[in-house]
Swiss-Prot record:
GO terms for biological process: methylglyoxal catabolic process to D-lactate via S-lactoyl-glutathione. Thiolesterase that catalyzes the hydrolysis of S-D-lactoyl-glutathione to form glutathione and D-lactic acid. Its cofactor is Zn(2+). Zn(2+) 1 binds at H52, H54, H108, D125. This is Hydroxyacylglutathione hydrolase. Pathway: Secondary metabolite metabolism; methylglyoxal degradation; (R)-lactate from methylglyoxal: step 2/2.
Amino acid sequence: MLFALPALNDNYIWLYQRENLPLIIVDLPETDKLFAWLDKQNATVEAVLLTHEHDDHTQGVSAFKKRYPTVPIYGPQECEKKGATQIVNEGKILTANYQIDVIPTGGHTKQHVSFLVDNHLFCGDALFSAGCGRVFTGNYALMFEGLQRLNTLPDETIVCPAHEYTLGNLAFAETVLVDKSAVEKSAVEKSAVEKQRIFVETQRAENKPSLPTTLKLEREINPFLQAKTLEEFTALRKAKDIF
């Protein structure tokens, strides 16, 4: 089971569960909706994963710990002050039922991490559908390196970003991407970006998430994954900042 629980203005709390096992929660922007969902599902929690320190990912930690004091909360070093109980900057996490890969994806924050659980990538604010996070550290090389790590994962990887930013990202992508495959196949055939935009507009009109996405699709529609060099990535990211 994979579920995107809307939170705050445009965040998602991701919940992942193998059948009949306790679930994993990714990021804690708030807890009221989360606790209501957990109660309704009569769910048990195995672990919480924090991708980075920003408040819109961690401000629910205190309330969560009061209700679930024994559940481990994993996160990078920068999340210790936010309430993380287990510090992980890279490597593997072994819980009772899950093996989780921790992938360094800094740049948005210095120690931002992404988590790979089975074939599900929980990438916080590092990678978005058709976009990537702002580089608040100013370290574009760190951000580029992190995205390059994610770009080595298989096509079938299910990508679970933390924000509903897809439509805005697609608008930017349409200005910078040329879909060669569509040109070669037929002048009438819509580009991958345009097709995805139509899908996302339909989803959002029905108040449904545009996510998750897949790495295969992102390789077609995401200019930041297509960037071949640090210079190209940096230029794209700076252009998106003022788009």
